[in-house]
Curated annotation (Swiss-Prot):
Pfam families: Ribosomal_L31 (PF01197). It comes from the Bacteria. It comes from Pseudomonas fluorescens (strain SBW25). The gene is rpmE2. The lineage of its organism: Bacteria, Pseudomonadati, Pseudomonadota, Gammaproteobacteria, Pseudomonadales. The keyword Ribonucleoprotein applies. GO terms for biological process: translation. Belongs to the bacterial ribosomal protein bL31 family. Type B subfamily. Keywords: Ribonucleoprotein, Ribosomal protein. This is Large ribosomal subunit protein bL31B. GO terms for molecular function: structural constituent of ribosome. Part of the 50S ribosomal subunit. InterPro entries: Ribosomal_bL28/bL31-like_sf (IPR034704), Ribosomal_bL31 (IPR002150), Ribosomal_bL31_B (IPR027493), Ribosomal_bL31_sf (IPR042105). One of its GO terms (cellular component) is ribosome.
Amino acid sequence: MKAGIHPDYRTVLFHDTAADVFFLIGSTADSDRTHVHSDGNTYPYIPLDVSSASHPIYTGQQRKTQVEGRIAGFNKRFASFGSGAKKAEE
């Protein structure tokens, strides 16, 4: 390997802002920001919008939302079916 062409591999603190969860991960990502972690050490800090702590695929929320949406759509579509609501209004 050539010297001086590879990025520095170091421990970086990633923060999932949606779930307020911190991850210490080895990375080559650059950051000008630093943050003091709960272990008392200062690490380069990179905020994240989504991680495994907040993404619906990993939390299981996506399925629940889809099911609720389908049920609500079904109930809305067939709310008056069989109840005679349209005949009573006419």
